[in-house]
């Protein structure tokens, strides 16, 4: 029924007139329920100011059918009358058009919760209005005082009759329960009548949602049995809405006995007061409807009544709606349906106090037909209510005999057992306070105490009288008013939190609940100490779970907040089928780091909850992103996360590779920190990906993703943390990931709050974080401020505090998951700390929140009478049984530090004298200064030192502090004096060796005049001191401000405005300029101010992080571009210098030593010579690009950088494939580690390394040098990305740079691919090289940098040793520059089927997956086209090993078949190109490839054009239309691979690592010309068919063009004769011929412009013409060449024809002499 309840009082109570304030309720003999002491209110505290909250009485047994209550939790009645209920037959569906006043028979449901009002049948005109609702009462018109106590000790029976099937009419009759043969005391002749209520939409009294449905509309009214039918049964504490589904609850027509007080049998004689509408025949029909306790509870409730005499009784209507509270639809409305059931006959029962309709737990026979009908109609409501089935109850209810435990949310409950109350008192509630939880008694034989009985009708009248009298005492209780206003205020906060997302109720039902994991202090996950299952009515509104103690609330209880609320934002819900004791358990983890367990009623209900919560989270996620298409957004996020995972995985792998060769502890620590950060990033990305897939599954109806892939991504530290926690699951992992997020802390501060007069305790999880906001750089309120502003506390997933009206004491927060930190955490954060000194002494200091590290150091030193500048402070922390030391920066706050001990240590002080000699222009170090407002220096720090400079040799190191200059203390100098001293030829410094801070914590500045670079990170100063000086001076000229109040908060670097503001105050600019022009070192300061970014792990040039974006307030877009470009060039210079040092220090001396073998040398330095030469060329192109832009330093808009950006982007596009040289070096890095391990055991090797690095600097070690190429190649995409971000997205240069960025990212992918291949097959490659027969190995090493192509082919003629039954064995073909390797790797699935006698060609263990491996050196390799006899397959080809000795034959033929003809074409071309290359090399020098590579260390003399032939998209289009034969600058080269090796359209083949796709795109006629030039040098007899096959032959679909091999040879001999005449001088000294002939520049890669398809293949006549034209170009007069250069530069930004580089990156003239 409705929301009315009666407050039962004990008759004869000693305190029947008043209640002692604050007295605790004595517990009853049974654990009826737990009542909070703070729930007891004053008797006189009830006024209309309660905002309609009223007192809240709760049913003892929640056998409620009515789910129409909105919010209000109910308190149990401790005493009350006996009542008997007759059950009606059917429910009616609400209909807006139902007539208002007609009774349709006697089978309509006249429910008080539907808005029916109680009317005495004597006078319908006599009524009162309370809160605007009609209330008419009869027979009891006297006031509260006129009701004599104890007038009738018998509780009346309440008979409820359904008067109509469809229109919802009901009659309630009151009968005296003591004598069944006697009518009611007021009207023996008839029952009390109810006023007819019309459930229309226009009803002004009850705007309850229409969720009723016909349950048995077709049942005749004659099916109703008598209310005293013997089939009435008692219940053992069950509740339909909480225990069973609608369709499986066998409700009988028994009078239902209270769970708490027990049942008392009564005579079974028929009630004489039954009206004639109940015929005797009704007794044989089953019920279609039952009246639930909640329905009766509505009958006995008054929201405005506060006190009553114990002797009186009150009854209130359910429709007292406070005029101050609007309708609240927050809670889901479950349907009030029951199931018709047929029950066995048994003796009727007496009704005692607390007796209300309940059902017995006895299994009953049901009418199958009726039940099935209802099942079909009601099944859809079962999930909505979420009720537990009857048969699951015993299994699932935790510790059912201790009901008060699972629902008692406070510690002061009524928990005494076996006690009969010695005294009685009325429990009084204030608005919003009576939120204790319901409780079930497990016995039907509860004790009945006679004085507890009351007259329900008298209660009803008392409540009416009290409600009238309360209107006169509104102003009498200020405490009540205060409480009421606070309730309203809390309600407003509640509405703000929940209505802001316009959430709707998605799901509601009963759930058992307990917290599992919570986030404690120091962001630690801990298991919740107090873990008991509790049951709540849970509604999912929006993305928030609201927990109520009872269900089905309506608008009467709007201001009654939910018991708790849980934000489910970004949550993950997972089923927990492995729970040891319970079924249908699921786990919810939210973004706040909390984990909760829930138990649903069934598996279906569980799945519905999971889907509902995930769908709500997905909806909120889409709203946050402003998207309407949630599915599309989630898919987009999924793709983005996959890309991030891929990128971070690669970066982490490279960092691990770097870590393996670094031995310096500090650098290792930095790398490990970076790896740990990448691991955490990957975990977060994997978690977000899993979450997105969960949301997608909920929206699309799919299965949830498998958590195995997520848990596999857990890093080792995370596994250890979860192992300590004892819970390794998706939910705990999610909580761990969320606990690292700073936003988690902010989210935890948002919650449902209720106003309290004083501050509550803050969660212990927030200890130490309260004053976080006082750091100047973070502009967000502190936790304390947040609470102070709302005057309240409350947190996610926690029980809300309650406010007592008669007590001003602050109430403790009762928390799920963490104890209360009851100590008030105000802004005064002070800690007593003992500080140690190295002399085993120490002092105790008080550290305040505003103290920085330097403040504590100064305080400690002052106490010990020491000089603070000569001491440092370090922190000791114990982590996993190891001790970590950390030196924080002086400007960091002590409150932010995590430590176990503080130690002060002395700094080393030493003097250095630096003197410049010869043409030395500077000392080689940079400084940063701290100045005061008078331009006097406070401190000077060394910000950078060049490695080979005078300063470095003198012992200066980054981070040292200069305390005196030439004997003058720094504090006595100003800027001009400092500049003058640094400009002298000699300077004496007193230095304090201050350690570099070990972490980079962002912080606020020291002071307004602080110039110290926070991170102490800077780029090396540029060698061009004059440019720096000009920029430095410009800074002083442009900016003149000393107002620091407008300086924005800075997240990194230092405030440049401070520098400008202080330095600009120096007068006499002309004099200042003269001083600065003579101070070379001060120019370094500018670089340090502008460039504060370097790698914390290695040399300052190699950082994996993108350069920081300068502050918009200080740098324009042009300045940013200039800064990034300058950084690119500067770091490139430093990198080339490092590579040169590697050669000078290690490579060249090692060649003269004997402790490394040739193979080990190859491993260490395999492709480094080529890499160095290439990097020199690349550096020249970058420098030329900048030098060509003479106004680079004065460009003011990004558009003016257009030409320069095209040149830079073109350089990257042109050389993209050259960077693939790094793939071999990176893949071989595993070998490098093995070689360097020898230094630990080989004393000679170790002595050599020590001699190379006498100062023991890690940056000068061999490991450090060998890791620099790995770092550098990963740096390029980051710099390009920064350039791309600074250009206009619609501009051509933006597109151009984007293409360059893509090319470099492909390089990184290629390097990773090569590493993967080496990991899989490197062992095979090394083994094949080692197993070569013969005294001198033809192939000494196979470098991944020389891998040109790999492909999978079918082997058509496998060896017999592999088994005759094997068909189409899959071979992997690896084409290297020096050899071709065939490998058969057996599939693991096929191992079992392999015959026992099968062995690979090379005998190996059965466990070896490589069943066949074969190496064919390039000198013994032939390739043959053609189909196998009798087949039409044109994808077959043959590899021939000509010098094979197997099976007694001179050659071994491998018949292979590719997947398609295109793949065949690609691989055959690559093999032929290496054959031709080997042939030419043999002609020229007859040296093996590896020897020529080692000798080729001559630097390149010419370089690529600045623009790399890519000017703009317009010229790109123009070039695409031009014929390749008209391209003037494509001479062939003599020592590189042929062009059909398929270099990228924008790259070269120098790396030897082309990709198949580009192979098919890049076709040219220069292959034939190259082949002809090479063949001309050989006699006929030495020429093989496989060596002279042209591209026409390769294009096997067409017949041979005109000409023959003989004719080709004749042509070559003619050319050879001409070449001999010109080749008079040795290489490198050829003078110009009379015709001005230039040395030929060879080039193996092509212009990045793709030719048209019809211009790729030409006949031999065309080749001869092209050859003649090329020769004529070479012999052109110089003026003609200049004219052509001008045309090229104007049209294509090509500076000269001679600035083309061959494929290997070397300058070589064509040598045509005889070998």
Curated annotation (Swiss-Prot):
Residues 831-902 form the RBD domain. A lipid is attached at residue 2 (N-myristoyl glycine). PROSITE patterns: DH_1, DH_2, PDZ, PH_DOMAIN, RBD. InterPro entries: DBL_dom_sf, DH_dom, GDS_CDC24_CS, PDZ, PDZ_sf, PH-like_dom_sf, PH_domain, PH_Tiam1/2. Disulfide bonds: none annotated. Residues 1-27, 174-249, 263-294, 385-418, 1092-1113, 1515-1582 are annotated as: Disordered. Modulates the activity of RHO-like proteins and connects extracellular signals to cytoskeletal activities. Acts as a GDP-dissociation stimulator protein that stimulates the GDP-GTP exchange activity of RHO-like GTPases and activates them. Activates specifically RAC1, but not CDC42 and RHOA. Mediates extracellular laminin signals to activate Rac1, contributing to neurite growth. Involved in lamellipodial formation and advancement of the growth cone of embryonic hippocampal neurons. Promotes migration of neurons in the cerebral cortex. This is Rho guanine nucleotide exchange factor TIAM2.
């Amino acid at each position: 029924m409705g929301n009315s309840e009666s407050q039962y009082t004990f008759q004869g109570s000693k305190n029947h007139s008043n209640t002692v304030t604050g007295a605790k309720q004595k517990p009853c003999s049974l654990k009826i329920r737990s009542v909070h002491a703070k729930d007891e209110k004053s008797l006189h505290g009830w006024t209309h100011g309660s905002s309609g909250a009223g007192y809240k009485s709760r049913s003892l047994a929640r056998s409620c059918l009515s789910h129409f209550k909105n919010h209000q939790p109910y308190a149990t009645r401790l005493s009350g009358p006996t009542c008997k209920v007759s059950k009606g037959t059917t429910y009616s569906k609400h209909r807006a058009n139902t007539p208002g006043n007609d009774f349709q028979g006697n089978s309509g449901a006249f429910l008080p919760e539907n808005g029916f009002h109680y009317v005495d049948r004597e006078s319908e005109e006599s009524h009162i209005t309370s809160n605007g609702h009609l209330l008419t009462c009869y027979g009891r018109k006297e006031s509260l005082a006129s009701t004599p106590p104890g007038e009738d000790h018998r509780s009346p029976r309440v008979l409820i009759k359904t008067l109509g099937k469809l229109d919802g009419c009901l009659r309630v009759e009151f009968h005296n329960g003591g004598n069944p043969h006697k009518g009611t005391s007021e009207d023996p002749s008839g029952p009390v009548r109810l006023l007819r209520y019309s459930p229309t939409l226009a009803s002004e009294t009850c705007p309850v949602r229409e969720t009723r449905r016909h349950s048995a509309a077709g049942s005749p009214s004659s099916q109703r049995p008598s209310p005293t039918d013997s089939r009435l049964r008692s219940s053992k504490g069950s509740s339909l809405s909480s225990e069973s589904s609608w369709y499986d609850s066998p409700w009988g027509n028994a009078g239902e006995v209270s769970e708490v007080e027990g049942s008392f049998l009564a005579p079974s004689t028929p009630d004489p007061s039954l009206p004639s509408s109940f015929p005797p025949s009704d007794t044989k029909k089953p019920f279609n409807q039952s009246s639930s306790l909640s329905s009766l509870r509505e009958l006995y409730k008054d929201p405005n009544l506060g006190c009553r005499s114990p002797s009186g009784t009150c009854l209130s209507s359910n429709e007292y709606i406070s005029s101050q509270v609007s309708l609240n639809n927050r809670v889901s409305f479950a349907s009030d349906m029951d199931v018709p059931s047929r029950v066995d006959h048994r003796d009727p029962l007496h009704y005692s106090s607390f007796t209300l309709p309940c059902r017995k737990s006895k299994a009953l026979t049901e009418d199958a037909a009726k039940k099935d009908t209802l099942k079909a109609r009601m099944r859809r409501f079962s999930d909505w209510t979420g009720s537990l089935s009857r048969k699951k109850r015993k299994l699932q209810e935790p510790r059912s005999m201790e009901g008060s435990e699972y629902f008692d949310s406070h510690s002061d409950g009524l928990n005494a057992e076996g006690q009969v109350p010695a005294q009685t008192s009325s429990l009084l509630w204030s608005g919003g306070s009576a939120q204790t939880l319901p409780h079930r008694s497990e016995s039907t034989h509860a004790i009945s105490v006679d004085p507890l009985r009351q007259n329900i009708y008298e209660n009803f009248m008392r409540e009416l009288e009290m409600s009238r009298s309360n209107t006169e005492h509104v102003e009498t209780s200020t405490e009540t008013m205060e409480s009421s206003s606070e309730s309203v205020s809390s309600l407003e906060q509640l509405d703000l939190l929940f209505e802001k997302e316009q959430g709707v109720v998605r799901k509601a039902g009963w759930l058992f609940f307990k917290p599992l994991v919570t986030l404690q202090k120091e962001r630690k996950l801990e298991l919740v100490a107090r873990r008991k299952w509790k049951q709540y009515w849970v509604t999912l509104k929006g993305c928030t779970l609201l927990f109520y103690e009872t269900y089905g609330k309506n608008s009467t209880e709007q201001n009654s907040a939910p018991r708790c609320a849980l934000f489910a934002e970004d949550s993950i819900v997972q089923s927990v089928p492995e729970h040891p004791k319970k079924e249908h358990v699921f786990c919810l983890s939210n973004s706040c780091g909390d984990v909760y367990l829930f138990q649903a009623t069934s598996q279906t209900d569980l799945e519905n909850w999971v889907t509902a919560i995930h769908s709500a989270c997905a909806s909120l996620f889409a709203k946050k992103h402003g998207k309407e298409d949630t599915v599309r957004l989630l898919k987009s996020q999924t793709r983005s996360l996959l890309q991030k995972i891929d990128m971070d995985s690669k970066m982490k792998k490279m960092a691990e590779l770097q870590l393996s060769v670094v031995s310096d502890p500090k650098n290792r620590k930095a790398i490990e920190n970076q790896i740990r950060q990448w691991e955490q990033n990957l975990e977060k990305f994997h978690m977000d990906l899993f979450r997105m897939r969960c949301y997608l599954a909920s929206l699309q109806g799919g299965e949830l993703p498998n958590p195995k892939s997520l848990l596999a991504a857990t890093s080792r530290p995370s596994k250890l943390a979860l192992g300590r926690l004892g819970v390794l699951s998706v939910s705990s992992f999610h909580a761990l990931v969320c606990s690292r997020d700073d936003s988690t802390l902010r989210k935890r501060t948002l919650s449902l709050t209720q106003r309290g007069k004083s501050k509550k305790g803050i969660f212990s999880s927030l200890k130490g974080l309260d004053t976080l906001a006082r750091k100047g750089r973070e502009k967000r309120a502190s936790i304390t401020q947040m609470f102070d502003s709302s005057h309240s506390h409350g947190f996610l997933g926690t029980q809300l505090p309650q406010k007592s009206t008669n007590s001003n004491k602050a109430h403790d927060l009762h928390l799920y998951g963490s104890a209360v930190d009851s100590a008030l955490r105000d802004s005064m954060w002070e800690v007593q700390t003992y500080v140690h000194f190295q002399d085993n002494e120490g002092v105790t200091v008080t550290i305040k929140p505003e103290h920085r590290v330097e403040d504590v150091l100064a305080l400690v030193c002052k106490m010990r009478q020491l000089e603070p500048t000569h001491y440092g402070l370090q922190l000791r922390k114990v982590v996993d049984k190891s001790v970590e030391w950390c030196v924080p920066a002086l400007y960091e706050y002590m409150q932010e530090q995590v430590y176990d001990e503080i130690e002060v240590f002395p700094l080393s002080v030493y003097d250095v004298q630096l003197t410049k000699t010869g043409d030395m222009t500077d000392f080689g170090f940079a400084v940063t200064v701290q100045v005061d407002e008078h331009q006097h220096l406070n401190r000077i720090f060394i910000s950078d030192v060049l490695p080979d400079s005078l300063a470095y040799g003198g012992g200066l190191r980054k981070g040292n502090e200069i305390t005196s200059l030439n004997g003058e203390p720094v504090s006595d100098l100003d800027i001009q004096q400092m500049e003058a001293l640094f400009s002298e030829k000699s300077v004496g410094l007193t230095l304090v060796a201050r350690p570099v801070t070990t972490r980079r914590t962002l912080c606020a500045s020291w002071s307004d005049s602080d110039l110290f670079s926070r991170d102490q990170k800077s780029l090396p100063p540029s060698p061009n001191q004059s440019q720096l000086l000009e920029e430095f001076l410009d800074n002083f000229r442009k900016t003149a401000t000393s107002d620091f109040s407008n300086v924005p908060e800075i997240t990194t670097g230092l405030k440049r405005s401070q520098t400008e503001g202080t330095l600009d105050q120096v007068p006499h600019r002309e004099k200042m300029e003269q001083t600065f022009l003579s101070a070379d070192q001060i120019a370094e300061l500018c670089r340090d101010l502008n460039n504060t970014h370097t790698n914390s792990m290695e040399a300052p040039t190699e950082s994996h992080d993108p350069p920081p974006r300068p502050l918009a307030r200080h740098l324009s877009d042009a300045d940013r571009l200039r800064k990034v470009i300058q950084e690119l060039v500067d770091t490139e210079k430093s990198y080339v210098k490092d590579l040169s040092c590697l050669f000078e220090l290690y490579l060249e001396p090692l060649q003269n030593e004997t402790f490394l073998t040739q193979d080990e040398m190859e491993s260490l330095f395999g492709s480094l010579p080529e890499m160095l030469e290439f990097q020199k060329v690349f550096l020249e192109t970058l420098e030329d690009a900048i030098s060509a832009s003479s106004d680079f330093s004065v460009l003011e808009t990004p558009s003016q950088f257009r030409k320069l950006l095209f040149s830079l982007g073109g350089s990257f596009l042109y050389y993209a494939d050259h960077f693939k040289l790094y793939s071999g070096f990176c893949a071989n890095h595993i070998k490098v580690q093995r070689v360097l391990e020898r230094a630990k055991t080989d004393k000679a090797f170790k002595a050599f390394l020590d001699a190379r690095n006498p100062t023991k600097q890690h940056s000068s070690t061999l490991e450090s040098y060998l890791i620099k190429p790995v770092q550098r190649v990963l740096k390029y995409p980051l710099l390009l990305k920064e350039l791309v971000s600074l250009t206009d997205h619609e501009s051509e240069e933006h597109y151009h740079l984007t293409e360059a960025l893509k090319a470099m990212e492909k390089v990184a992918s290629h390097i990773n691919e090569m590493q993967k291949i080496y990991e899989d097959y490197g062992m095979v490659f090394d083994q094949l090289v080692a197993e070569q027969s013969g005294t001198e190995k033809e192939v000494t090493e196979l470098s991944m940098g020389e891998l040109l192509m790999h492909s999978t082919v079918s082997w058509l003629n496998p060896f017999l040793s592999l088994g005759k039954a094997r068909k189409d064995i899959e071979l992997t073909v690896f084409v290297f520059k020096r050899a071709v390797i065939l490998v058969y790797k057996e599939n693991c699935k096929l191992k079992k089927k392999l015959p026992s006698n099968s062995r690979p060609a090379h005998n190996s263990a059965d466990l070896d997956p490589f069943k066949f491996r074969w190496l064919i050196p390039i000198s013994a390799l032939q390739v043959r086209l053609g189909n196998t006899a009798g087949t039409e397959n044109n994808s077959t080809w043959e590899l021939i090993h000509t010098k094979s000795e197997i099976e007694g034959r001179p050659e071994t033929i491998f018949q292979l078949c590719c997947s398609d003809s295109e793949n065949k074409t690609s691989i055959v071309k690559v093999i032929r190109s290496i054959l031709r290359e080997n042939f030419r090399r043999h002609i020229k020098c007859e040296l093996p490839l590896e020897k020529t590579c080692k000798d080729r260390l001559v630097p390149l003399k010419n370089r690529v054009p600045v623009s790399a032939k890519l000017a703009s998209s317009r010229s790109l289009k123009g070039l695409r239309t031009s014929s390749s034969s008209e391209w003037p600058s494509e001479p062939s080269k003599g020592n590189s691979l042929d062009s059909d090796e398929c270099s990228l359209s924008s790259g070269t083949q120098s790396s030897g690592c082309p990709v198949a796709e580009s192979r098919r795109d890049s076709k040219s006629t220069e292959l034939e010309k190259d082949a002809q030039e090479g063949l001309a040098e050989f006699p006929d007899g030495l020429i093989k068919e496989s060596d002279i096959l042209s591209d026409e032959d390769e294009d096997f679909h067409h017949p041979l063009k005109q000409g023959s091999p003989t004719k080709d040879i004749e042509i070559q001999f003619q050319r050879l004769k001409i070449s001999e005449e010109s080749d008079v001088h040795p290489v490198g000294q050829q003078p110009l011929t009379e015709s001005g002939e230039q040395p030929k520049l060879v080039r193996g890669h092509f212009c990045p412009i793709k030719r048209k398809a019809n211009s790729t293949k030409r006949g031999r006549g065309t080749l001869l013409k092209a050859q003649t034209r090329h020769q004529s170009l070479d012999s052109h007069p110089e003026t003609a060449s200049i004219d052509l250069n001008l045309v090229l530069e104007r049209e294509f930004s090509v500076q000269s024809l001679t600035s083309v580089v061959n494929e290997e990156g070397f300058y070589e003239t064509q040598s045509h002499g005889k070998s």
